[in-house]
Regions:
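Active-site mouth of glycoside hydrolases
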Residues: 26-239, 243, 250-251
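Aromatic- and carboxylate-lined catalytic core of secreted/periplasmic carbohydrate-active enzymes
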Residues: 264-268, 275-279, 291-428, 441-457
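Bacterial Sec-dependent N-terminal signal peptides
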Residues: 1-23
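Catalytic-core region of carbohydrate-active enzymes that cleave or remodel glycosidic bonds
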Residues: 201, 222-322
Length: 457
């Protein structure tokens, strides 16, 4: 009898262990049937990303798990991380990523050796997987390729190593490039993209471009590119003067609009807008800094224009600024473990919740809903809709005239959605008119942002 009890107990433990391991495997991310969005197990997947560029190189395992857990609780489901920021890259424990700074010769070790650079990446990936978080891996930062003159053979060897090592992980996304124009070393970028795609065809791949550009400029028709990324960047309207850029200023919705109209259809998102608490234009730390209101604006503007998600960033968190740093970049003043709870980070989940609150895959940009005066710059109104609903975003809380007659049904239920706290205030239900006027709560001002929700009845 005792032996039977022990045997049953052992079997139960094994089954629980298997079940636990299976629960850690995340569903494969795929492109939706209409090629506009992501899906996981056929369900909508809204990319709610955070920028954790130096996670692998600057945090120990305890802090890495702390970071991931906080972001999980805040609703983030993707973290963008550099694999190699430089050829001299080391991790928190001092272990080098490469032998002799040779990208074609990674310094690997037995899987049981805890302080190996690559073993630590493995560990972080597994922890993220347990928490339901996908990791967008940037194989090598753009400046490394440009300055070190990495050739195609080295790139292929390195990409082969990465793809083989991480193709079995359920939570990997590939983010080729790294703050660089695709035209700079384009053969290397195509080599990395093609190599990873050939070995690991089941994981999505994109390209992280230079500020004020979009991956579609160079790679839209490449078979390895699953979806587009833009970097609307960190400059304000007055700073966007470069002749070589698209010069959209802060209007990140324009980049999304460009990608949305391209064929073949591919999803697109803003993978690097202005970071919370980073100076306007990055480099002059005496200038004002972007706030939570700004990161909300970039999020709602881009998503309502047709993006499949959005990546948030924070100046202190993206560089994992901590007391051991000899200095900081871009005037970072606070430590990552404090800034991780900044207002903008806590407000991002309300964007995700709103987008998933209505039928998702049918959603399209819908500027024709705005009857008059779509507005310029901060006064721009951005509209999106499904078959029976519509969302219209105002950053300044200004009055709006809406073509409610475009929605089906005889009645319209109207509500205000607050992007700062996720609360919904019902305006009322009324007989459908051709056009209707709406006046958001509060006085018009930058950051008094609201979403008008219209539901057809």
């Amino acid at each position: 009898m005792f032996k039977n009890i022990v045997l049953v107990g052992l079997i139960s433990c094994v089954l629980l262990s298997i079940k636990s391991q299976q629960a850690e495997v995340l569903p494969e991310l795929k492109i939706s049937a209409n090629h506009r969005f992501f899906q996981a197990d056929g369900k909508p997947f809204f990319w709610m990303g955070d920028t954790g560029w130096l996670l692998f190189s600057k945090l120990n395992r305890e802090d890495a798990e702390k970071y991931l857990e906080i972001r999980r609780k805040q609703g983030f489901n993707v973290i963008q991380v550099m694999v190699l920021h430089s050829l001299s890259e080391t991790d928190f424990y001092g272990d080098s990523a490469l032998n002799n700074r040779n990208i074609a010769n990674p310094k690997i070790a037995d899987a049981n050796y805890p302080n190996n650079y690559w073993n630590n990446i493995d560990w972080v990936l597994k922890k993220a997987e347990e928490k339901g978080i996908y990791i967008a891996l940037v194989p090598v930062w753009g400046s490394v390729v440009k300055s070190a003159h990495i050739n195609q053979n080295q790139a292929k060897t390195y990409a082969t190593f990465l793809a083989n090592r991480y193709k079995s992980y359920s939570n990997v996304i590939w983010m080729n490039g790294g703050d660089i124009p695709g035209s700079d070393s384009i053969k290397v970028w195509n080599t990395i993209g093609n190599t990873i795609h050939a070995i690991d065809p089941n994981h999505l791949i994109t390209f992280h471009p230079r500020g004020r550009t979009e991956s579609s400029i160079w790679f839209h028709n490449e078979p390895w590119l699953s979806f587009n990324s833009i970097q609307s960047g960190h400059r304000n309207y007055s700073q966007d003067t470069s002749k070589n850029d698209l010069r959209y200023g802060e209007d990140n919705w324009r980049y999304i609009q460009n990608d949305y109209n391209k064929t073949p259809i591919k999803p697109t998102l803003d993978a690097e807008p202005s970071y919370e608490k980073i100076p306007y234009g990055l480099h002059d730390i005496t200038l004002p800094r972007w706030t939570d209101a700004d990161v909300r604006r970039y999020g709602y503007w881009s998503v309502f224009a047709g993006a499949c998600g959005y990546t948030y960033g924070n100046n202190d968190v993206m560089q994992m600024h901590n007391p051991k740093d000899k200095g900081s970049a871009y005037g970072s003043k606070d430590y990552w473990y404090t800034s991780i709870n900044d207002p903008g980070a806590q407000q991002m989940v309300y964007l995700e919740k709103l987008m998933l609150s209505r039928p998702y895959f049918e959603r399209v940009p819908a500027q024709s809903l705005i009857a008059a005066n779509q507005g310029q710059r901060y006064n721009r109104l951005i509209a999106t809709r499904g078959k029976d609903y519509a969302f219209i975003y105002t950053y300044t809380g200004r009055n709006m005239d809406i073509n409610t007659g475009q929605l089906p049904g005889k009645k319209i239920k109207a509500s205000w959605y607050n992007p700062r706290n996720g609360e919904t205030t019902i305006i009322g239900t009324f007989n459908k008119l051709k056009t209707a006027k709406f006046n958001p709560p509060g006085q018009p001002a930058n950051g008094n942002d609201w979403v008008l929700i219209l539901d057809a009845i």
